[in-house]
């Protein structure tokens, strides 16, 4: 079947009333960015639907795949656009039915947005179904559990007919919900947290704390790869890599061993808070899950949050670990996240970290040293990378160069 359009159905943005135009425009911009590099199509965003007009050479499978990854899209269908006549609809219905397997069942489903069309829904269903039965042998009607469903949408401008409905990612268009800073550790949880907030229309930049030589270049490249996977959905993402060795060593020098984990997280939050204001973000996002580890109890969260007035969003707060793993596999980050390269959260880990830290004690331990200068120095020396979906690490670039030189 040669389709001439893709029908793109909006997600929750259809509920946005007077703000709908803003959401539709943002989604259209996101679609154009996602489809960059492809040709043979024209995007037409309308109030209730988006239509993508296809030329003969358009790569419909690649276009559909990319659309399915864009937040704000509920579903996509390859469609035939036909004239608003029963003859044109009947001819298209026969085209669809000619693709059916022998002895298969079908159903005609009609949605009539144009209430002025001369035939009502049931008349159209009977007429088109009857035409298929007359013209195509060895098929029958089954309205409850059909093998095939020919869908007909009667709209003001034309008739759109299709069979396939490809699920989209749902949610809201990224860019409609403000900017946040994602604390990206390299584990399983934080990439999922980032994906969850992006699904709500939020733009992210990411921050990663790197402590060489205790953490390796492989750990850094792992985080770059996780950011690249996230960027496949939304376009370029800025990754801010913080030199954290000096701060982490100082914490372990002056803070009681059982409190070093709590204090380390507080230092991370203080650095993140300064960066939030620099980049114009409105919140900090992390992958914390309530009660999962010592640093993620309510007592710990209270002690850590106290260093910032910036809202801290925890989209995975109540998830079971298995739920997070399933989502990680769905979005494609799991295999990268489980690579065995230590991040700064796993080094210097005390044997018995306190699970219910006393806030006054944390402050007392940290008061013996003024960390502000170190924090400012860490912020000043941040390395910022813009990660795109085709970003290559330095190691990959060097490998490619060696191959090219050899050839």
Swiss-Prot record:
Ranges for domain THUMP: 61-165
Alphabetical keyword list: ATP-binding, Cytoplasm, Nucleotide-binding, RNA-binding, Thiamine biosynthesis, Transferase, tRNA-binding
UniProt-recorded Gene Ontology molecular function terms: ATP binding; CCA tRNA nucleotidyltransferase activity; tRNA binding; tRNA-uracil-4 sulfurtransferase activity
Record keyword RNA-binding present: yes
Primary location: cytoplasm
Biological or metabolic pathway of the protein: Cofactor biosynthesis; thiamine diphosphate biosynthesis
InterPro entries in UniProt: Rossmann-like_a/b/a_fold (IPR014729), ThiI_AANH (IPR020536), ThiI_fer (IPR054173), ThiI_N (IPR049961), THUMP_dom (IPR004114), THUMP_ThiI (IPR049962), tRNA_STrfase (IPR003720), tRNA_sulfurtransferase_ThiI (IPR050102)
Official protein name in the record: Probable tRNA sulfurtransferase
Organism of provenance: Staphylococcus aureus (strain Mu3 / ATCC 700698)
Gene name of this polypeptide: thiI
